[in-house]
Amino acid sequence: MYFYNLVKNTDPEIAEAIKSELKRQQNKIELIASENFVSIAVMAAMGSPLTNKYAEGYPGKRYYGGCEYIDVVESIAIERAKKLFGAEHANVQPHSGAQANMAVYFAVLNPGDTILGMNLSHGGHLTHGSPVNFSGKLYNIISYGVDPETETINYDEVLKLAKEHRPKLILAGASAYPRVIDFKKFREIADEVGAYLMVDMAHIAGLVAAGLHPSPVEYADFVTTTTHKTLRGPRGGLILCKEKYAKLIDKSIFPGIQGGPLEHVIAAKAVALKEAMTEEFKNYQVQILKNAKALSTRLIERGFRLVSGGTDNHLMLVDLRNKGITGKDAEKILDEHNITCNKNAVPFDTQSPMITSGIRLGTPAVTTRGFKEGDMLEVADIIHDALTNSDTKENILIRVKALCEKHPLYKEFDE
């Protein structure tokens, strides 16, 4: 564990915390839909000497000297992002998905302008207009949700709201929506009311890159994403847009909302983007979907109710009300059995956001470990047994350990 040895002589407390976190990741089954495990190459790029360099500005136009190699790194990242997603322009500097979203808002909106976005409790994101977030404080937010019967987006309702409120920007994308989103339909709605169309594809970027989910790039004026999650890169953000908006977006990031970019993270983004161009990565994304189908199908067989009846992507929402257990309690119980997930509101939830009636499950991280469909059937059975007391805790922990040992994680660090 090279980083442990490098850190422990200076700071043994932090070194021990790092070591413990590695062991947690190795010995638990990670089902949080927004998490993944980066490659050693991505991790190494983040720990490189690039972290030492200030580089305010953009390649070829910096406010500091000595940026010639930084320019090489960032230019490669930009070109790879454009090529991977077929975009006219890319900004790789956002520190996070939230920063990417903020930059788009600040580029084309004024305080008080109207945004039409997905309700957080129906699968949206904090930055899509939640009243506790800057987006909900600065802008007039109109929210659309899912149909009570189908639990999928009702595009007729979105159009109706758009005609009624005439938003300046319509936002598509979600953090907990298990179905394919029709970006073409959103483009038609935006055109009908003269609105910008922005798509936040943070959760599905890897699937889009592999051609397994319709791409929003040809339809949206702006596309934002994180670079982790299904894209399996470092924690960070990315903005794609039409060339005509390039200067607006770049100015909005710097000097608008950020100062110096994190060039060590941008290097890691570049490495991850190169990995995403491989056949191996596409096969990985195919397996994510296969694993999600296997997990969701088995959970339904074991009596769990899935929001919308299943999944088209990497995640699923499990409504636990028929099991008489809250999302908060389920998260805690599963964690005690070495399975990590997160509590999550389900559409029309009556529980508070800190309690919830459901959990969100995803397959990107376990698929990176090498889990296949058969493993996911066992995972579903373990979830059932843990939440219904159908097996002893001791036996379940043995079953989880067997899966983790079958598919070791970062075994290079154990040498």
Swiss-Prot record:
GO terms for cellular component: cytosol. InterPro entries: PyrdxlP-dep_Trfase (IPR015424), PyrdxlP-dep_Trfase_major (IPR015421), PyrdxlP-dep_Trfase_small (IPR015422), Ser_HO-MeTrfase (IPR001085), Ser_HO-MeTrfase-like (IPR049943), Ser_HO-MeTrfase_PLP_BS (IPR019798), SHMT-like_dom (IPR039429). The keyword Cytoplasm applies. Gene3D superfamilies: Aspartate Aminotransferase, domain 1 (3.90.1150.10), Type I PLP-dependent aspartate aminotransferase-like (Major domain) (3.40.640.10). Its EC number is 2.1.2.1. One of its GO terms (molecular function) is glycine hydroxymethyltransferase activity. Catalyzes the reversible interconversion of serine and glycine with tetrahydrofolate (THF) serving as the one-carbon carrier. This reaction serves as the major source of one-carbon groups required for the biosynthesis of purines, thymidylate, methionine, and other important biomolecules. Also exhibits THF-independent aldolase activity toward beta-hydroxyamino acids, producing glycine and aldehydes, via a retro-aldol mechanism. This is Serine hydroxymethyltransferase. It comes from Caldicellulosiruptor bescii (strain ATCC BAA-1888 / DSM 6725 / KCTC 15123 / Z-1320) (Anaerocellum thermophilum).
